[in-house]
Amino acid sequence: MQELGSRTLSVLAPRVGTVTISPSSAAELTLSERDHGVAARVLSALAGPDARLRADQERAVAALVQPGARVLVVQATGWGKSAVYWVATALHRARGRGPTLVVSPLLALMRDQVAAAQRAGLRAVTVNSGNVDQWSAIEESLRADEVDVLLVSPERLANPGFGRRVLDHLAGRLGLLVVDEAHAVSDWGHDFRPDYRRVADVLRELNPDTPVLATTATANARVTADVATQLGEATLVLRGPLSRASLQLAVLPAMAPLERYAWVAEHLPTLPGSGIVYVLTVADTARLVDAIRAVHGPDYPVAGYSGGLPVEERERLEDALRDNRIKALVATSALGMGYDKPDLGFVVHVGAPPSPVAYYQQVGRAGRGIDHAAVGVLPSGADTGVWDYYATSTLPDPRQCEQILGALAAQPEPQSVVALEASTGIRRGRVELMLKQLAVERAVSREVDGWVATGRSWRYDAAHYDGILAGRRREAAIMTDYLAGSRCLMELLAMSLDDPDAGPCGRCSVCTGALPDGWSTAPSQAVVATVAQVLRAQHQVLEPRKMWPGGASGLRGRITAGELASPGRVLVHTDAPEWAAARAGCLTLDAPPPPELTEAAVRALVSWRGQWSERPGVVVALAPTGLTQVATGVAAHLAAVGHLPYVAWPLPAAAASLESDREAAGAAQVQRWSELLTVPESVGAATAGRVVLLVVDASSSTWSITVAARQLRRTGATDVLPLLIHRRP
């Protein structure tokens, strides 16, 4: 007889201090013979005719059919958490109760869950940003009680329109509420999402008899306690061992950024089966795919994956990997929680995540249904800088929160994010983050027409957020120990999750003293050279900004055609590994550009000129970040090669500090750049009546380029073609 998964149960009531169901009473929870029949039908549809609930899964299901039950399941990937809520759903529906609401964090995860529920004989639907045209029909089916399972994202749960139309109707008659990946509810967790706190509001609005299940594979003792507290006093916590016997973990020696790309390209064909190569940024997904194809040819079966792709494209790529039609997806963390491919043969990380818990969650995609999967990480000294950014980027800034609350209090009507950006001078992304954090503490509320202050007093809890930051830094320290190979890798991951059963695995590169068969400690230099050559020949399109930010800038609405730059080109995009030496040298220290950078600029113009309406008539050098030697060096070289006149546009020293201000809103930047970027007489005379090739040293926001193009057009330039040497993160 087949059982779903192979983990044993540990009921850890004393560890979290919020559980009132004792281990002995939990052990007494069983299903009736009739319920076993329903469960058998669901499980046979999911996993074959011999599938049965194990004793630990049965206890969870038996608890969930009790009125008002609160259950938190912390079990390793592959244990069968989803089987618990599909069986519980079937039992509730058999009793004539309402549908199950599943809160799930990712579209990829929701799609897999819908497919699994449908295999189990349940009518499952999802409401998400990718199926807006189906919302009305889905809501009508819900009102007619024709849906067994509704899956939504936490962001959808927080949407006031959805709450009014759907949640208010369901709250009193839900059969079961499921919070998947529940560690995201806790701001002590590695993947806290403020919108998940909307779950607490749903709990308060629920019929108190509605059972609630929260599931995760990545919660340490503190996160477990926090989630259990939010669920309620009588929460039953079911927790099992988290080590994964099928995974062979390995840490490779530190390599230069380009060497990591080359290592993946060289070793990918030898890795078992199909798998995932995780990278830290969206830009890395495209660059690494190009590096792999540079070595193995343009038709090599590999593709990039990120949350920015259209839903249909993500689904196509997920299916291609699931069906082994491609060797690997090079992916950001958007392909993570819940992606279901039991025979995933490998996971390789190019750059380490900031948290061992996040790392455990991602490598947990591998080896779920096979005996062996290879897992490796290629660390870099640059990883710690990324970790520092993520440690603080989601924490509220008290000054910005007070500004936003003041702006809301000053207006009688709901305010949009755009309006708040303009009135506070805080950039849009930070406004959105602060609003979500303030909404968690109910200081603001999102209405249909915008955001309003609730009138509830708000105080920045410095001790709480200092504790969160300290916790994240402790996790980063554990990740540093992991990369240093200080002890068994699986044991260290399990210990980071407070697993009492953690112990040496006997399989990892620390336990064996060796890398997996066929893995080298460095790539061949020939492969490194091939990858460098191909990547340095590529250039990204720089799309011009088309709208003014409004606010203090005094400029609002669409940028007129007579003030607009044409699409440009970028030579070095963010942290491009092929340009690591230049980024550490002239693009940081303001030194003359190396020959490979000026040659790349010439190649960019050669490939770009087919899109020009007219050939440039003059080259202008502009250095808003103060890298004057870089801007003038590249501009002068291009002018000499193209036999064009060349002129430098000098800027005051204050310009560099403005370009480096990451917190300044667009309106504030445009206002200051408009003051700083007055066109000198020499530049105006050289550019009037001509197409300008504008060579810019570096920029992050590109507002300096937008304003410079406007000023040049207003003083007579017929067009502006920006060549941005370094697009900063």
Language-model region placement:
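PRPP-dependent phosphoribosyltransferase catalytic core
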Residues: 706-729
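Active-site-facing substrate-recognition patch
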Residues: 247, 531-618, 628, 632, ...
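Active-site signature of alpha/beta-hydrolase-fold catalytic machinery across serine-
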Residues: 86-87, 91, 226, 633, ...
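Helicase motor core with emphasis on the C-terminal RecA-like subdomain
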Residues: 28-36, 41-45, 51-82, 87-93, ...
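C-terminal accessory region of SF2 helicases/translocases
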Residues: 348, 352-361, 367-568
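A glycine-biased structural micro-motif
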Residues: 413, 687-690
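Interdomain "pre-motor" coupling segment immediately N-terminal to P-loop NTPase/helicase cores
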Residues: 5-31
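Short glycine-rich phosphate-binding loop at a beta-alpha junction
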Residues: 211, 614-626, 693
